[in-house]
Amino acid sequence: MSAEQFVGRWKLVESENFEDYLKEVGVGLLLRKAACAAKPTLEIKVNGNKWHVNQLSTFKNTTLEFTLGVEFDETTPDGRQFKSTITIEDGKVVHVQKRIKDSDHDSVITRWFEGEKLITTLQSGSVISRRAYIRE
């Protein structure tokens, strides 16, 4: 798997169990509803080990910049803060979010390809959401 496969614009086309995931990680009702109604586009750029990911939607735009394998401070769109590390393992991009506050919940976000689709799973505890994107 080449990191270059991820480069481009990706439009959300399928979403399963996303609201349950957001509830599990502690996102409030109004923000959950808004996030579930949004149909985000991902813009991914890669330069060596440095990645730049924009998530664009009518709900909120976010930017995530990171270097593979290097821990960084991350603030989620709803304001939760994590120590995060993103690596490539077995052809998948694995994003581990470790909570800073005891009231937050750790998550693992994994991205890989199934045919032409970019699949993303978001897991916290026993709750797993699956989302699929297609290239624009």
UniProtKB/Swiss-Prot annotation:
Keyword Transport: yes
Keyword set, alphabetical order: Lipid-binding, Transport
Residues bound to a fatty acid: 111, 131-133
Any one of the GO BP annotations: fatty acid transport
Database matches in SUPFAM superfamilies: Lipocalins
Gene Ontology CC: cytosol; nucleus; perinuclear region of cytoplasm
UniProt cross-references to CDD domains, sorted A to Z: FABP
InterPro entries listed in its UniProt record: Calycin, Fatty_acid-bd, ILBP, Lipocln_cytosolic_FA-bd_dom
Any GO MF annotation of the entry: fatty acid binding
This protein's name: Fatty acid-binding protein homolog 5
Organism encoding this protein: Caenorhabditis elegans
